[in-house]
């Protein structure tokens, strides 16, 4: 897909996959609306990208905050064509029996409600304009339990179903909803997982994690017609065939 002149909204854009995606999409000619809770990192990133970028401080757990940010992106660039639901957290990592209920709920607010809020805010305008792409970062944790990750596993399983629901309800409206399970990525989240010392994922060597630009480049590829066959589904970047199609290997 030629994304030149298109507008992409990226949540969790301050670091990791989100920040890499901002650079990849901007390099491809897209306008990028950078969403994050703290302003410093996205202000710096927007300045580096230039006129194609706008920074929008936003709490994805609040629908009003997300709706306002999406509206500002549309006001600035004229449209919202692509939404990348990337914002997500995993801390505090804790066993169910000792998890703090409020902290557990906060992860659900960000990882699940944050995705719903983004989808809900963009769908009416995308439908009115004839379509758009809603890409959501998923996880292998959506498919099986991981020790001390009950909040993360539950939120990612629910997010997978949200993608399927959007496809079922709005696929005929031109909405391309696709999930991306990137595998383990060399980001701050893996630093936090490593520090926990809990479960086999925390024991992985750093060099087995893929670089953050891989999922970023996959997200760009997912905006093109080659990915149409995957609408309503979840792609796994562990798949070597997919890596080849994206041009990663």
Located regions from the model:
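Conserved glycine-rich cofactor-binding loop
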Residues: 14-15
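Substrate-binding pocket helix/loop in short-chain dehydrogenase/reductase
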Residues: 94-96, 103-105
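Active-site helix of classical SDR
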Residues: 119, 155
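Residue(s) in the substrate-gating loop at a strand-loop-helix junction
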Residues: 139
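Active-site-adjacent segment of SDR/Rossmann-fold oxidoreductases
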Residues: 144, 160, 165-175
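C-terminal helical subdomain
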Residues: 175, 179-182, 187, 196-245
């Amino acid at each position: 897909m030629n994304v030149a002149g298109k507008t992409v909204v990226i949540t969790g854009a301050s670091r990791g996959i989100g920040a890499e995606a901002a650079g990849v999409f901007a390099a491809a000619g897209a306008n990028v609306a950078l969403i994050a809770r703290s302003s410093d990192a996205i202000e710096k990133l927007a300045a580096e990208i230039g006129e194609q970028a706008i920074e929008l401080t936003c709490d994805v757990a609040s629908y009003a905050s997300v709706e306002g940010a999406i509206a500002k992106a549309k006001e600035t660039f004229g449209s919202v064509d692509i939404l990348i639901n990337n914002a997500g957290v995993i801390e505090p990592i804790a066993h169910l029996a000792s998890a703090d209920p409020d902290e557990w709920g906060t992860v659900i607010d960000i990882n699940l409600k944050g995705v719903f809020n983004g989808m809900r805010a963009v769908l009416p305008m995308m439908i009115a304009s004839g379509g758009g792409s809603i890409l959501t970062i998923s996880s292998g944790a959506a498919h099986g339990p991981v020790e001390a990750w009950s909040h993360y596993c539950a939120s990612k399983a629910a997010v997978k179903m949200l993608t399927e629901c959007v496809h079922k309800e709005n696929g005929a409206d031109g909405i391309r909803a696709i999930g991306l399970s990137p595998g383990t990525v060399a980001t701050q989240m893996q630093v936090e997982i490593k520090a926990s010392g809990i479960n086999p994922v925390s024991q992985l060597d750093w060099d087995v994690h893929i670089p953050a630009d891989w999922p970023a480049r996959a997200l760009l590829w997912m905006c093109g017609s080659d990915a149409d066959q995957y609408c309503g589904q979840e792609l796994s970047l562990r798949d070597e065939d997919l890596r080849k199609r994206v041009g990663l290997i």
